[in-house]
């Protein structure tokens, strides 16, 4: 099941609960950063893992802002992951997977 473009929280929650009742073994919420409230609510309401996907547009925004010197790309990349997990995601999918794994291996992110 995937919650996306759900501008109505109640409708998104209803979809998630229905999908779990129908046998879904995971709930995917995307885009990650825009829907952290849904990640939090869904993770509290279902008994299956909640995954979130940081979509290509989020990746492109961070890359572009870093290229302009407006942000620290690594810091933002790490904060995005921490935010997803803090919201309740058990799985975080990102285009930054390799870079994020390196930061975790080096102890720069828990």
Language model features: what each stretch is:
Residues 19, 42, 84:
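Conserved, mostly hydrophobic/aromatic
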Residues 35-63, 109-110:
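Alpha-helix-loop-beta-strand connector modules within alpha/beta enzyme cores
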Residues 1-5:
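Conserved small/polar residues in nucleotide/adenosyl-binding loops
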Residues 13-16, 39, 81:
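Generic hydrophobic/aromatic pocket-lining and core-packing "Φ" positions
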Residues 67-93:
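Internal helix-turn-beta structural module
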Residues 27-29, 50-53, 92-94:
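Hydrophobic faces of well-ordered beta-strands that scaffold small-molecule active sites
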Residues 22-25, 45-50, 88-89:
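Glycine-enriched alpha-helix->loop->beta-strand junction motifs that scaffold or abut catalytic
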Residues 7-28, 98-107:
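Active-site/ligand-binding-proximal alpha/beta "capping" segment
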């Amino acid at each position: 099941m995937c919650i996306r473009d759900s501008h109505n929280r109640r409708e998104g929650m209803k979809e998630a609960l229905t999908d779990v009742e129908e046998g879904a073994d995971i709930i995917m919420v995307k885009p990650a950063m825009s829907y952290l409230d849904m990640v939090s609510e869904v993770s509290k309401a279902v008994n299956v893992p909640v995954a979130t996907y940081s979509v290509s547009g989020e990746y492109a925004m961070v890359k572009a802002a870093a290229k302009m010197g407006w942000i620290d790309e690594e810091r933002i990349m790490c904060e995005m992951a921490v935010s997803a997990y803090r919201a309740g995601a058990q799985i975080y999918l990102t285009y930054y997977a390799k870079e994020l794994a390196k930061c975790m291996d080096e102890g720069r992110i828990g």
